[in-house]
Amino acid sequence: MERKDFETWLDNISVTFLSLTDLQKNETLDHLISLSGAVQLRHLSNNLETLLKRDFLKLLPLELSFYLLKWLDPQTLLTCCLVSKQWNKVISACTEVWQTACKNLGWQIDDSVQDALHWKKVYLKAILRMKQLEDHEAFETSSLIGHSARVYALYYKDGLLCTGSDDLSAKLWDVSTGQCVYGIQTHTCAAVKFDEQKLVTGSFDNTVACWEWSSGARTQHFRGHTGAVFSVDYNDELDILVSGSADFTVKVWALSAGTCLNTLTGHTEWVTKVVLQKCKVKSLLHSPGDYILLSADKYEIKIWPIGREINCKCLKTLSVSEDRSICLQPRLHFDGKYIVCSSALGLYQWDFASYDILRVIKTPEIANLALLGFGDIFALLFDNRYLYIMDLRTESLISRWPLPEYRKSKRGSSFLAGEASWLNGLDGHNDTGLVFATSMPDHSIHLVLWKEHG
C-alpha cells in the first residue's frame, strides 16, 4: 500500500475506532495482537512500558529530577539506585543530595569538591562508621605499661601521650605503637604539658619544673606556690608559663627566666585548671588574636588579662549558681569562642564575646556526665562506667563505650580526650588514633582508640 493510501486508511479506521465502545476497542486490540508477528509484538512491548509506566527521572529535565531527589531520604535514594541503570546514573550524579546526606550525619564537607560519585562513596563510608558507633563497634582498647606508682598527670598531642607518675618519672609514649619514646626522672607529677623539646611539670611538692626530653635535665625550676600545683600551661611566643595551685592562686612566670611575674588571687578553692588561649571573637574586653588566661576551681571560672601589673584584677567570673550549691565538673573547654564546662545540671556553654550562657544541655537519663571534648558537631562525655558521644545538634547520645574501673581524680588530671578534630565533624580521615586515655589502679594507662574502617 502506498504511503498516501495508508495514511487515508489509517485516518478512516481511527475515526471508526474512536466511535467504538470500550469493550469493542478491547476486542479490536485483541484481534490485532493475534494477527501480529514477532516484530510487531517487540514494538508493542517497548512502547507499552513508556505509556503505562512513566519514568519521570528519564523524562524530566535533569534539574527537575535533582530537585525531586532532594525530598527523599538517603536510604530511599540508595534503594532507588537499584531500580535501573538510568535511575542509578541520575541519582549518583546529584552532588547536593549526597553532600546534604553527609552533613546530616555530622560529616565535614568541602563544597569545592563537586564530584557527586565521590560524595556518594563518602556517605556510604559515613553510614558504616555511624552504624559502628551505634552498635558499639567503632573503638578498640589498648594499655600502656611502665610506671610503678599511681599516674595522676596526662597530656596528649599529635599522637604522643605524656604520663607523669608518683614514681618520680614522666614518660612519653607513641600511641600508635605503644612504645615509650622518652623516660626521664622528675619530681611527683600532678600536671604535665610538653612539646618536641621540653616537658613542663606541676608537682605535689609545690613547684613547677621544665625538663629537656633529650637529656632529661631540669632546665628551670619555678618556686613560689605554697600548695600542690594542679595545672600548668605555657606559650613560647609570650615566654609565659601559668600555674594553678591548691594554695588558691594562679601564678604567671617568665618561662625562660623562671621568675614570677604575677600572682593572681581571688579563688577560694583549689585552682584545678589554667588555660592560655588566643581569643577568636571581638568583645568589649578583647580583640581577635589577644591571649586570654582562664582559671577554674570547684565553683568558678575566672578570666584574666595577660599582663605584668601587680594586683591584676579579674575581668569576669562565671559560675552556674550564685550560692555555690552546684559544683563544676573537672575539665574546662575553651577554644577562643566558647567556654564549656559540665555540672550536675548539665553542660554549660558561654559565648566568650558576651559572657552570656548560650545554652544548657541537659542529659536527664544520665546524671553527672563529665566533659572530655566539645566541638561544632559532637561532644565527648563520660561517667564512671561509659564513654559517650553526643550529637550537639539534637543533644542526644548516639554512642557509648564501656570503661573499666579506672582511677578518676577529682581534679580531672588522670583522664583526657585524644584527637579532637572529629568533634567538629567526621571526614573519613580524622576518625583515627586516640579517643580517650585514663590511668588505672594497677598504674597502667587504658587507651580507647578508633578502630580502622571495616
Swiss-Prot record:
Source organism phylogeny: Eukaryota, Metazoa, Chordata, Craniata, Vertebrata
Keyword Amino-acid biosynthesis: no
SUPFAM superfamilies (UniProt xref): F-box domain, WD40 repeat-like
PTM sites of type N6-acetyllysine: 298
Subunit structure: Directly interacts with SKP1 and CUL1.
WD repeat intervals: 139-175, 179-213, 217-255, 259-306, 313-352, 364-403, 410-452
Biological process (GO), any one: proteolysis
PROSITE patterns, per database record: FBOX (PS50181), WD_REPEATS_1 (PS00678), WD_REPEATS_2 (PS50082), WD_REPEATS_REGION (PS50294)
Full protein name: F-box/WD repeat-containing protein 2
Task performed by this protein: Substrate-recognition component of the SCF (SKP1-CUL1-F-box protein)-type E3 ubiquitin ligase complex.
Listed InterPro entries: F-box-like_dom_sf (IPR036047), F-box_dom (IPR001810), FBXW2 (IPR042627), G-protein_beta_WD-40_rep (IPR020472), WD40/YVTN_repeat-like_dom_sf (IPR015943), WD40_repeat_CS (IPR019775), WD40_repeat_dom_sf (IPR036322), WD40_rpt (IPR001680)
A Pfam family assignment: WD40
Gene Ontology CC terms, in alphabetical order: cytosol
